[in-house]
Amino acid sequence: MEAVIKVISSACKTYCGKTSPSKKEIGAMLSLLQKEGLLMSPSDLYSPGSWDPITAALSQRAMILGKSGELKTWGLVLGALKAAREEQVTSEQAKFWLGLGGGRVSPPGPECIEKPATERRIDKGEEVGETTVQRDAKMAPEETATPKTVGTSCYHCGTAIGCNCATASAPPPPYVGSGLYPSLAGVGEQQGQGGDTPPGAEQSRAEPGHAGQAPGPALTDWARVREELASTGPPVVAMPVVIKTEGPAWTPLEPKLITRLADTVRTKGLRSPITMAEVEALMSSPLLPHDVTNLMRVILGPAPYALWMDAWGVQLQTVIAAATRDPRHPANGQGRGERTNLNRLKGLADGMVGNPQGQAALLRPGELVAITASALQAFREVARLAEPAGPWADIMQGPSESFVDFANRLIKAVEGSDLPPSARAPVIIDCFRQKSQPDIQQLIRTAPSTLTTPGEIIKYVLDRQKTAPLTDQGIAAAMSSAIQPLIMAVVNRERDGQTGSGGRARGLCYTCGSPGHYQAQCPKKRKSGNSRERCQLCNGMGHNAKQCRKRDGNQGQRPGKGLSSGPWPGPEPPAVSLAMTMEHKDRPLVRVILTNTGSHPVKQRSVYITALLDSGADITIISEEDWPTDWPVMEAANPQIHGIGGGIPMRKSRDMIELGVINRDGSLERPLLLFPAVAMVRGSILGRDCLQGLGLRLTNLIGRATVLTVALHLAIPLKWKPDHTPVWIDQWPLPEGKLVALTQLVEKELQLGHIEPSLSCWNTPVFVIRKASGSYRLLHDLRAVNAKLVPFGAVQQGAPVLSALPRGWPLMVLDLKDCFFSIPLAEQDREAFAFTLPSVNNQAPARRFQWKVLPQGMTCSPTICQLVVGQVLEPLRLKHPSLCMLHYMDDLLLAASSHDGLEAAGEEVISTLERAGFTISPDKVQREPGVQYLGYKLGSTYVAPVGLVAEPRIATLWDVQKLVGSLQWLRPALGIPPRLMGPFYEQLRGSDPNEAREWNLDMKMAWREIVRLSTTAALERWDPALPLEGAVARCEQGAIGVLGQGLSTHPRPCLWLFSTQPTKAFTAWLEVLTLLITKLRASAVRTFGKEVDILLLPACFREDLPLPEGILLALKGFAGKIRSSDTPSIFDIARPLHVSLKVRVTDHPVPGPTVFTDASSSTHKGVVVWREGPRWEIKEIADLGASVQQLEARAVAMALLLWPTTPTNVVTDSAFVAKMLLKMGQEGVPSTAAAFILEDALSQRSAMAAVLHVRSHSEVPGFFTEGNDVADSQATFQAYPLREAKDLHTALHIGPRALSKACNISMQQAREVVQTCPHCNSAPALEAGVNPRGLGPLQIWQTDFTLEPRMAPRSWLAVTVDTASSAIVVTQHGRVTSVAVQHHWATAIAVLGRPKAIKTDNGSCFTSKSTREWLARWGIAHTTGIPGNSQGQAMVERANRLLKDRIRVLAEGDGFMKRIPTSKQGELLAKAMYALNHFERGENTKTPIQKHWRPTVLTEGPPVKIRIETGEWEKGWNVLVWGRGYAAVKNRDTDKVIWVPSRKVKPDITQKDEVTKKDEASPLFAGISDWIPWEDEQEGLQGETASNKQERPGEDTLAANES
């Protein structure tokens, strides 16, 4: 980038002169363009294709952010790039057109007239033969050195005027200033015939309105034209001829028009409005292509002409495209004839080349119009490119320059710039706001938002400038002009003896007190000294106003001294007499009389006060000291006045007050009626409402309105999502104490003007929290509103680096008080931030308010705050470019080169912010020494963070996260090395924020060192006079870098940088340092605005020359100095390490032993084999907890450590390990377990290692295949017995299939091992012996609730089934509660009896405390099944289905298709219970009630064996019950009864082998159905499926397994 900056800077100095931008500005612009993705690399700026997108993007950015610095720089750079490019193109095209370059192309001669394609080949640069110009170029030097003087004779034959040669058609190439090109010397002899009229044109020309040939055509006087033009410079001329609309007739133009145009171009330039007007006038009628080209040859130089030809061709292509789309386009002749094409429009078609007569005869009128219009548009573009205008960004309104002149210069520059047309109007308006005088800027800021064009802005400013300026003299002049007609009307009426309401109303006479006349006309001449007389000036007794001798503090003069008082009455009208001195040093004070017009009694009906004329105040304010105490006041709608000493409470007069201004002669001005404000101010103020009543219209105001916080034009509208429908969330109730606090806070915000009453359809809750001080804080829950907003993008990517402040510059820190509450919300967005102030018990309608300012908690508030404050400060940044101003949120830091400059700038910044409506806390203004900003303490030479706590409190993962975040903020300032951050990074592992963490010893030791570092280390402020240096080094657990000055001698660090955490399994140190160098260079440009001057590299790079490729890529474009030296002492705290560039691993075989490695996931072994003579040596390593990749890595590491000092070849079939080992050719940072294993092994070797990868199980014979097979067979060999298989599963919990393959056991054995594991079963099986159902009635019940909508409103049915007899009891309930459960069980006990145990799910109604106490009272055991698994209650679930099906059938039979009436529900439920309990089910011969009350005594069946957990078959058991998939067996010795899966039961026939299969034993069990009591029962329950047979944990091992 540095090289590109140098090239661009040099070009700017060449073509821009004094206005060229600095290298810093160019670098900042290039960085911005790369950051925004507009440039892939800085060198792309040379490509013209990127110029327009860059211009559009920077223009858009300037309009949005109001910052035009980069756009200004780009404008200068673009002008320089275009000038350089045009200069190069011009030199090449000039040679091309004149035949001076490598080509041999020249304008066509007469011999080309009959070859239409010739000129096309000329445009393409083809060689067409030797022409006139080429022959002239071969002249001798003495012939070409002296141009031939242009005379009045024929250029062709030398005869006098009137020869036929004057009409020869030889289109000349005349250029302005052609004497610069020697090859043009003498060309006039060959090209002087350029009258542009073909032979015979005189005879074929027809006059308008006549048919046939004209007998005497009017021709152009060519001799006169040549004489005229010869005196102005061009030696050769082509005369354009106008085509009239009446027909193909040519009307010659006045030669002086061409002469004047050529002279105008030479003197005024192409961009001159005069030039443009003359060209447009000359081309107002359609011209032929021949005439257009010759005209441009006359007025344009060689380079502009070449540019014009290209631009003309582009414009003609546009016409052709339009004509192609529209067959009836005028250029197509309204669809008659062939369509137009480029050859026709350029005059290159057959019969047109060099033949103006043919062009006039063949071209259509529509084509002529298109040709001329395209030529004129191309001329405009060439004028803009050939003579680029000055940069518009430098244009500022001068102190004495009028706004119109400034607007003229600005618009001309912008229109001539390269800005897109759509961006010009916004740029002009933005320049009006920033580049004009302050008073004009203020006028534009107060303009309505509907003014969107430059013309509207200009008209608005001119209209407002018609009034007098706001000065003392301006006020006097304005008031004099306003009152003068009033005085004249009064004088005329007095002279005529008339009175009426049309003039000024007469006040009271100050002599007699009577109305209708004034003191001068009073018939009663009172004597002086009368004690009853009151003075109207001093309010004293005993004298009148003329006799008043009271002196003010104005050197003994009364107010109004110095203003003339004309005679009254008299022949002349009186002059304006005001009670104020119109001087800048005096305050404009007036005497005022206030009269209360109310009807209630008061002590004083009128009072006299002195008030200040303040055109900056919106309203009239009477001081509390001047306001009579018995005059009533009331609360105002806006209870605060802002702008007069801050926020001041205000009240308003309840009665209408008549206000009159007393003139110097004692006369009273026209009284006004108003309701003034009353406030505690130092003096009364007459605002604009009073001044306008006096006839003054003050519109060009300076400063903001006094009753606003921040002008509304600074409000930034919010962006809403497309579905931003109003959100209404009810206000939740608040306790009385918090409600009182909320009411007080709302009233306070209302008085401050932050909120306003609302009727919005939006609502979100508000609440209060108690602060540590005991007071309350108002909070607004805006989460629902934020969800509807489109968040603004970040406008500040991070906090500024404070060490970049110039060393020794004094500092000042400002704090904006309540910044959010000083910025208004856009009016259309306020309703979305409404809230409700509730009342207790709804005693009154709730009061609703909405925010007028930025509310805290809105997602866009911080961004808007930054944008608004930045917009206010932007003019100051432009005005004081040398001032360093840091702005972060509501904190400002100013730095200047001197204390005086800092104080002056600080005062200006404060006044600017206060005028904008912000408040600066005086106690928050910091000056040196001891300045603190953004958590740092700044001195004149250093920047240090504020001290850390002694030892933080760490209890959870979230505490560690917050601590690490704080340390990351301090690392760039303290240089905390990676080794001190390691213990804290270790504690960040985990995903639960509440996971427990402890403050361990490693963290404590690291923290102590960090605290000690914070007391001794600090950043040094940057000295711009010294070179900026950068250094990088490898250290423990990472790499570290620093930007500073004097790093190798007396280190002064300015910024620390660190390598990032590795993202790959292994990262070489060379790559780590490469990334750090790139980061260091980018940080230098971003922070200090410049590239590093000196870069210090580790000493290893000095020994390894040339530099590695990665380092060279990181140094691309670096123009500073590179030094390689030992590690600077500044890195001692990081414990630097040496960087080795030695290659440790290669992929080519090396001389040495060859070893083979392999690992197996089935055996969890890694092996290394190598051949020793005829025998293979083997080493193994086993780890049941390691992955196969780790086993492969450990096997390779074991092979590497066999011969550490001997080159070794390692052959592996693991592509993963082979690729990783090759990447570890140089030292680096591992980040995975496998990488750590390999890095540890490589670090212990001193010899080269080669890693060779082979494919496993390949058929290729040879040594490598043999060795790999040996390693593979050793890794996979294992013979696990059953006990070892169980141990393997206990360690790894692998599945049965993997266990069978790994241990070489059967699938059946593997499943049994897995089923015995309590952790691997989704439904863990309980020990054998827990009965899943009762062997007799009242042993085990199952209870559940089921929903039956037909039984609404009491639609919940509690169902209990006896697991032995299948008897069902059902009760109906409205809700599922503990009371309902207890009522149901009590009913079931009353019907069936008390059970020993009840089994349910784990619902809250079954597990509540009251239910447990109820069961304990009845002595009933209670068990629960799997949470949320209804299939654990198999019998009751089937009973639910049977019950609901029976209810449906009975209801439909009674005609109730949907809901059962409440009156019928009890009867129908009883019917269902009766049908289920008292009738046989299916093929059963007994009913459930019979089974329940008359149970069958179980008899023991044949002897059986059962399979226990060890896999052995145990004898001594007899069958009691045999069901579908399960069996109950009884031990013959202990009488213990247990339930086991049927597949674990087989007959106890000793003569059979123990491996008798199940199908062999089935005939034995086929005949036992006579004594199995459960068989009928199972069929009666409609048959169990495999899923329905699964019971709760603890019931049946079979059920758990089959699930």
Swiss-Prot record:
Effect of P172A: 75% loss of budding
Domain Integrase catalytic: 1333-1496
Compositionally biased region (Basic and acidic residues): 128-141
Pfam family, any one: Retro_M
GO biological process, one term: DNA integration
Reverse transcriptase domain segment(s): 750-938
The name this protein goes by in its record: Gag-Pol polyprotein
Gene: gag-pol
